Amino acid sequence: MGFIPQMFFSLLLASWFTDLRLRLKCTGFFKTVIYMPNLIMASAFSMLFYTIFSDAGPINNLLNSMGLPTYRFLAEVAGARGLIALMNFLMWFGNTTIVLMAGIMGIDTGIMEAARIDGASSFQIFRKITLPIIKPIMAYTLVTSLIGGIQMFDVPQILTNGNGNPDRTSMTAIMYLNKHLYSKNYGMAGALSVILFIITAVLSIFVFKYVTKDMVDTGAKTSKKAKK
């Protein structure tokens, strides 16, 4: 759930940090801050969130001090799923931002200067120049984020005590696979592994083809014009 806002905010931050006209201060500090969660172990991050959002945690203490009732984040479907998505977002959007920044910084500045001279706005430059050029990098980040989401295990495992509560609505495919391995049901675990591989491969190919479709079409048109 978290990789969609992750891509949006990462792309937004990457465009801000690489825009020299904004003259943002302390960009190095902010880059370090947004990347820091990526360096924290997922298990430690999960325990931190478990403590903060527990029934007697700081968040509920704050709600009680404001006269609001205790909200059982880990006992509600929306609460548990929302926390997992938030943790996944915080842990990985910094890495995605750095990757997208590298792609944007690799664009020839002369192209953008020429577009500005021709009267293009910043939004037009971003939509017509930046996005098409970094599409391969976006495809890479989307595919890796998709695979990471399918393979998610440690965060929901720790946050829900391995049960995927409430009512197994937070149980991931890898948690289900791990339960079969733990119970020595190797046949079911092997079948599930193959199914996960097929699903991952199909979705990855679909995302990559969809994102890079315009590039292939443009290349084909250019090739036809060259032959003529």
What are these regions (language model features)?
Residues 1-228:
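A structural signal for multi-pass alpha-helical bundles of membrane permease subunits
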